[in-house]
Amino acid sequence: SKMNKFIEENGFDTISILHNSSYDFDGFSVCGSRGWFFDSDEEHNEKVLNREVMRLKASIESAKNEEKIVFLHYPPVYENQNCKEILNLLKEKGIKKCYYGHLHGMAAKYAFDDNFEGIDFKLISADRLKFVPLLIKKF
């Protein structure tokens, strides 16, 4: 991919990109995708959503550990809306923790940081965390 080529050409040897893949650690796997929030009938949005669901599915299915932690850019749950396609996949695959970004500033006050249908969701955008990294899990 373009990103992997850029990383390699610039000698960034501590950065890896999730792309239809996962990273396996001792006892858990990190999975993810950009995700999407489908709230329109536009054909383009449906196409992007379907592609992102397939990417996330590939990422989760590539994981070797039972515990899988998912990271998304877009929130699958926001205010009184949710992205049922992403949520259904997370439930189908037994995901218990999902971290997401995208929401900044005033939009972050509407973030969903709670359990929804058996999955714990948490907004981890940099400004929400006051630019202090959040320890997800020690390994």
Annotate the PLM regions:
Residues 17, 30, 98, 121-123:
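Conserved beta-strand scaffold positions in the cores of enzyme catalytic domains, especially
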Residues 68, 96-97:
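The start of beta-strands in P-loop NTPase/AAA+ ATPase cores
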Residues 7-10, 99-100, 123:
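Intrinsically disordered, low-complexity segments enriched in polar/charged residues with Gly/Pro
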Residues 12-15, 102-105, 118:
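Short amphipathic alpha-helical surface micro-motifs
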Residues 2-85, 89, 138:
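Conserved catalytic scaffold of divalent metal-dependent phosphoesterases
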Residues 71-73, 101, 124:
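A cross-family glycoside hydrolase active-site/sugar-binding cleft signature
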Residues 24, 47, 88-94, 106-139:
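Binuclear metal-dependent phosphoesterase catalytic core
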Residues 1-2, 22-24, 38-41, 75-81, ...:
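Active-site environment of divalent metal-dependent phosphoester hydrolases
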